[in-house]
Amino acid sequence: MGFCGKLFKDPEVDMEKSSANARQMRLLFDQTVEGGNEYRLIFGYTEDVSRFNYGFVHGSKTKIGNLIVGWREADQTIVVVPTVPDLSGCGDPTYYRRSEILKAYRNKYPTDAFIIYPDKRSYIGINAYDWLEDEKLYVYVSQADELAAFTDFFMNRFAKK
């Protein structure tokens, strides 16, 4: 590999750090969700974008919400637990059972997100990637295999229109 190859090399995942965070995600999820060990897990996040217009100044502000997302194929349930990037704590779980939701689908544009409408008034958009490098905003975890399994579950056994 020449100089240019080293200069433009993609960042590499620190698997030790990723594994430690995956274990911490599991610990938090299992403490919060009854029967948590029966669920498979991925890291996901939500984006809340607000726009502003002050005369000549226009813009937007984005808030990121970190999520531990668990799914169980046996009863077609997704559980979402809010957390923070350093995994120092988490909030209360929200359950989405396929039999109880209004609709669920994958939205490819403008962002690749898994959208769940539990009713007509609310929804959650779960964004998930195999790895995100920004540790200040996101949980540092590599999850290519888990994300592929979640995508398969969501698209083939959970989605409904």
Residue ranges, per PLM feature:
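Residue-level detector of solvent-exposed, low-hydrophobicity positions
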Residues: 46, 50-52, 61, 78, ...
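Short linear sequence elements within intrinsically disordered, low-complexity coil regions
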Residues: 34, 44, 100-101, 145, ...
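Anionic N-terminal interaction surfaces
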Residues: 2-73
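A structural detector for beta-sheet-dominated domains
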Residues: 42, 107, 117, 140-142
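Phosphoinositide-binding peripheral membrane targeting modules
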Residues: 55-117, 123, 132, 153
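Terminal and domain-flanking low-complexity segments
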Residues: 5-16, 26, 133-161
